[in-house]
Amino acid sequence: YTFTGTGSYGIKVESGNPKIVMNNANITVNAGSAIDIPSGSTTTIQVIGDNTIGTTKTEYWDAPCGGIFVAEGGIVNITSNGTDNILRAHGTLAAAIGGKYVNYEESHNAGNINISNVTVYAYTNNYYAAAIGAAGEGTCGTINITNAVVYAYGAGDQYTSAPGIGSAWDSLDWLDAIPIVIISNSEVHTFRYNPYSDYIGYLGDESGDTYATGSINCGDGGSVKNSTIYCYTGLDATTTDKVVIYDADGNPTENQN
């Protein structure tokens, strides 16, 4: 299935293991997800050129609008033949890539996310979701980033901050688990909204009564190898808080500004 040009519609995978080719496509939605992947499906998204998917909304909304929703038990493989190919994904009340959150009460768990050989920009404009990962009280499966360039922009307000990659929260409770994140041979730029959250890992708030420690937390079993993580505070930040370089064994060297 190949999509190109501009359109206002969602792509819903009913079953099976399809390959979706995004060839210089611009797909927007006002509700639901630009691409919806069910449990049991392994869906491959082949990226060609410069592509944008998801919501154009910039305000809070009462229905989730996501870029790519992959249900628990499902797998999405986002790939291309090189990092000159770009996918830009936007979500509100939903991760740009991952889970979604409905009416402040209902969370949908996310499955596994594999990003390889591609450049991805992921944005969420609501702190109930990480840019890549979980939304609300939902969980997310394993996030693999391999031979890729990723920019992940978490959201927030003056009291709360979501990580670029990781978990989120709802109005009832803090999530006590984060996705397993495995990064190799990649360049990751992660933007937290303010200093309360992790860069990768947990959401946080001004009370400090959360699991966030302002760190790169890849979860139990996660790792970073042969990769560089650029850490920013503020969605418009142009200067890093720190740059952490990981060698082939996962040993970090941190350079702070």
Model-derived features: positions:
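A composition-driven surface/loop motif
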Residues: 1-257
